[in-house]
């Protein structure tokens, strides 16, 4: 049965979420409308509030309800360390899983000329100004290991070098608990090349 009107619009709207295809979107829609209208109202209100209140941090470009995020506003963070990530989700992952005490800069994407994403779309003019003026001693590149992520890392490394800022790249390789026989060749090669003293 083909849906029309408001139901079809809600199904299509839910498909914008990562990992949500047409069947999952339809199940979500029908659940919210049939069984949990209160939750649907709360979801609608929470989304409206977030859209109204949440924007980008003026300094690092992560999501925040204030002009500066909790990291940039904190006087206890090491301002000489600047970690570059592709998305706000990575800020949360690094903060939750590591002892990192420096600042972040969120690209909200990665260089991808074929998709029309260049340095301007990633706020690299803002980053370059920070490298010039903010006393950054080390730029930590934590972009993904995709082709675009690697190209972005090289571009940022060149930028940092022009300003005399040390650049490091987070290690990539074998996941903790992983077995070598199941690791792809490129990952194994990268891990082998990045070995360190033990």
Curated annotation (Swiss-Prot):
Pfam families in the record: RecR_C, RecR_HhH, RecR_ZnF, Toprim_4
CDD domains: TOPRIM_recR (cd01025)
Keywords: DNA damage, DNA recombination, DNA repair, Metal-binding, Zinc, Zinc-finger
BP GO terms, sorted: DNA recombination; DNA repair
GO MF annotation list: DNA binding; zinc ion binding
Chain ranges of zinc fingers (C4-type): 57-72
Domain Toprim as annotated: residue spans: 80-175
Superkingdom per UniProt: Bacteria
Alphabetized PANTHER family for the sequence: RECOMBINATION PROTEIN RECR
Known function: May play a role in DNA repair. It seems to be involved in an RecBC-independent recombinational process of DNA repair. It may act with RecF and RecO.
Assigned protein family: Belongs to the RecR family.
Protein name: Recombination protein RecR
Species of provenance: Methylococcus capsulatus (strain ATCC 33009 / NCIMB 11132 / Bath)
Name of the coding gene: recR
């Amino acid at each position: 049965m083909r849906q029309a009107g408001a139901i079809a619009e809600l199904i299509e709207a839910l498909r914008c979420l990562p990992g949500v295809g047409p069947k999952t979107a339809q199940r979500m829609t029908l659940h919210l409308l049939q069984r949990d209208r209160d939750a649907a109202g709360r979801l609608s209100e929470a989304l409206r509030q977030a859209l109204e209140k949440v924007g980008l941090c003026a300094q690092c470009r992560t999501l925040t309800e204030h002009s500066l995020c909790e990291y940039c506003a904190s006087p206890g963070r090491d301002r000489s360390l600047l970690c570059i990530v592709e998305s706000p989700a990575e800020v949360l992952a690094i903060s939750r899983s590591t002892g990192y005490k420096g600042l972040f800069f969120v690209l909200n994407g990665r260089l991808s000329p074929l998709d029309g994403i260049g340095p301007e779309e990633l706020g690299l003019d803002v980053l370059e100004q920070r490298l010039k003026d903010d006393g950054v001693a080390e730029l930590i590149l934590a972009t993904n290991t995709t082709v675009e992520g690697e190209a972005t890392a090289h571009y940022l490394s060149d930028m940092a070098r022009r300003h005399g800022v040390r650049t490091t790249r987070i290690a990539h390789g074998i996941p903790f608990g992983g077995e070598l026989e199941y690791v792809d060749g490129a990952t194994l090669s990268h891990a082998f090349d990045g070995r360190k003293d033990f």
